[in-house]
Amino acid sequence: MKNLYIAEKPSVARQFADVLGVKGNAGNGYLESDTAVITWCVGHLITMSYPDAYDPNLKKWSLTTIPFIPTEYKYEVLPDTKKQFNIVAGLLNRDDIGCIYVATDSGREGEYIYRLVDSMAHVTGKEKRRVWIDSQTEEEILRGIREAKPLSEYDSLSDAAYLRAQEDYLMGINFSRALSLKFSNVVQRYLGMDRCVIAVGRVMTCVLGII
């Protein structure tokens, strides 16, 4: 059986490969040796679906359909990263993979990136361990692998990541639609624009206010 290491980006995967002595052509979306397989995400491979994925009628913006608060959230593979997702999903479910080492960035967002892929790939029956490192030096990578804890110990971090993403989604979808429907005509006339969307976001709006 082989170990599978999944990094957040190709550059980090290459560093893991160098440390573990895994050679090969990265153009295939992964690297492989007799004992290990190393692959990577390219940042986010999965995104939250827009409202029209729940109901086609929600594609049209209307004050009567907000707030939009789904009881269960839908996710989909990003079109630009579908090829890499299929590669990663296939590796995660390979019969000869015994243990998955999650080596996405050590933090909430890195946790979220892997958990979404894991969920969409329907990975079951595999041992999963979390590599938590502070740098990509050889010593730190080896320590992180050696001391990797069961992925389940990071479930609370995963829950926090999902909730943060859902908060951002609800705020962006609902407030952007509400403010655009109410005030876009005024902004269009003032700026001499043909069309205007007033985008609202948890971070974006705060930064704009500071500027």
Name these PLM-found stretches.
Residues M1-R177, C206-G209:
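Intrinsically disordered, low-complexity regulatory segments
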Residues D168-I211:
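Prokaryote-biased recognition of long, low-complexity C-terminal linker/tail segments
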